[in-house]
Curated annotation (Swiss-Prot):
Purpose: Probably functions as a manganese efflux pump.
UniProt KW keywords: Cell inner membrane, Cell membrane, Ion transport, Manganese, Membrane, Transmembrane, Transmembrane helix, Transport
Protein name, as recorded: Putative manganese efflux pump MntP
Natural source organism: Geobacter sp. (strain M21)
Family per record: Belongs to the MntP (TC 9.B.29) family.
Length: 187
């Protein structure tokens, strides 16, 4: 697999992570280096590990995984996005915004944004190509674009406030819907 192909796949896979990071950056105030590291590291790590997992499992479970992966991603993204929209409408004095770079929220977002990378790993296995270089590049690109998305999201959050939090939640829901439609109606 040539470098241009690997880079193209990496950027395409990182787009969901970038969009989620944009939404996360809009709701975290102030964003610290810890936030950037946690989300960038975990999104990059999951994006790198999923193709390896797909490659290792190969064709043995492809039918089972492909039947449910889109539902898992849809459910996770709609849950987190819905919670963001709900929190945007809560009273400010009662509100302690949840940090999407911590705990189960971070894990759910990491899994949801990297499920497509698992399918790429299955494809790489079918090609008989080593997964190690593509997985490394996929992880690095996802990590860098996640940090860039958070920084851009912070600027939007400072300027537009709650509207960006609502939009961010809706974007997560729409990404989930897009994944679901791509794997069901548009197949």
């Amino acid at each position: 697999m040539d470098w241009l192909t690997i880079l193209g796949i990496s950027v395409a896979l990182a787009m969901d992570a970038f969009a989620v990071a944009l939404a996360a950056g809009a709701v975290i105030s102030p964003i610290t280096g810890r936030h950037l590291f946690r989300l960038g590291f975990h999104f990059g790590l999951f994006q790198a590990l999923m193709p390896i997992g797909g490659w290792l499992l190969g064709m043995t479970v492809q039918r089972w995984i492909s039947a449910y992966d889109h539902w898992i991603a849809f459910g996770l993204l709609v849950f987190v996005g819905g919670r963001m929209v709900h929190e945007a409408f809560e009273d400010d004095e009662d509100k302690t915004p949840s940090d999407p770079t911590k705990g189960m929220t971070m894990v759910m977002l990491s899994v949801a944004t990297s499920i497509d990378a698992f399918a790429v790993g299955l494809s790489i296995a079918m090609l008989g190509v080593s997964v190690w270089l593509p997985a490394t590049v996929i992880g690095l690109v996802a990590g860098v674009l996640t940090v860039a998305g958070m920084l851009m999201g912070r600027r939007l959050g400072e300027k537009w406030g709650k509207r960006v939090e609502i939009c961010g939640g809706l974007v997560l829901c729409l990404i989930g819907l897009k994944i679901l439609l791509e794997h069901t109606l548009l197949k």
